[in-house]
Amino acid sequence: MQIQDNVFIVTGGASGLGAATARMLVAQGGKVVLADVQAEAGQALAAELNAVFVQCDVTSEADGQAVVAAATALGTLRGLINCAGVAPAMKTVGKDGPHPLELFQRTVNINLIGTFNMARLAADAMSKTAATDSGERGVIINTASVAAFDGQIGQAAYAASKAAVAGMTLPMARDLSRNAIRVMTIAPGIFETPMLMGMPEEVRTALGAMVPFPPRLGKPGEYAQLALAIIENTMLNGETIRLDGAIRMQPK
């Protein structure tokens, strides 16, 4: 799949992994629609990249449809990169009692259902496009986490939501094979996201030192590099790739 002159949607595109991916796509000649709840940051990045910003709650069907409509108005939609998500920390039973059910539901709703919502809507639009010379119509890249495999204390909701994203990768890829649309998932380790960058420097350094090699936090641009490789390599389909420097998370 070539990026040049094609249209790509990036959810969670206003910051972090999504913003790095949007920059990569534009650098490769792609047209980008940024979808995010953060209006101010999203509009600023869209202006910088000459992209389109649509304020979007990924759990909303109407918002998702508006994003896809904006993308198809730009040209031929060829890809969706799902980076929107939340990462709460709460024990199953803590000092204040049981894990709030609303928080668990919200986490699953955004991370899992929001991912599926955007994927199904984008896939429907891509399925109606003419195939490329290689026979491909599009690619969907979802974002899980190493927590899907090595969930830590306090990550029951987050790990469950991300494990489900990894779990639906293969069946979704099989579903969409008849439409010539690929589905891949990236499971990042500890990355320089806005949440982590708000921590004290000594904490960030200690977290980076936990990574076998390279012994540092991952950079958003490295996520974007993998997204680029997935987009360009048509044989990559139906798999979750850990991008984590060989880390295996300890219980806490």
Feature map (PLM): residue ranges:
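Alpha-helical segment proximal to the catalytic Tyr-Lys
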Residues: D124, A173-D175
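Residue(s) in the substrate-gating loop at a strand-loop-helix junction
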Residues: S145
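Active-site helix of classical SDR
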Residues: A119, S161
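Canonical Rossmann dinucleotide-binding motif of NAD(H)/NADP(H)-dependent dehydrogenases/reductases
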Residues: Q2-V32
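Conserved mid-core segment of classical short-chain dehydrogenase/reductases
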Residues: A87-Q105, D124, K128-S134, G154-A157, ...
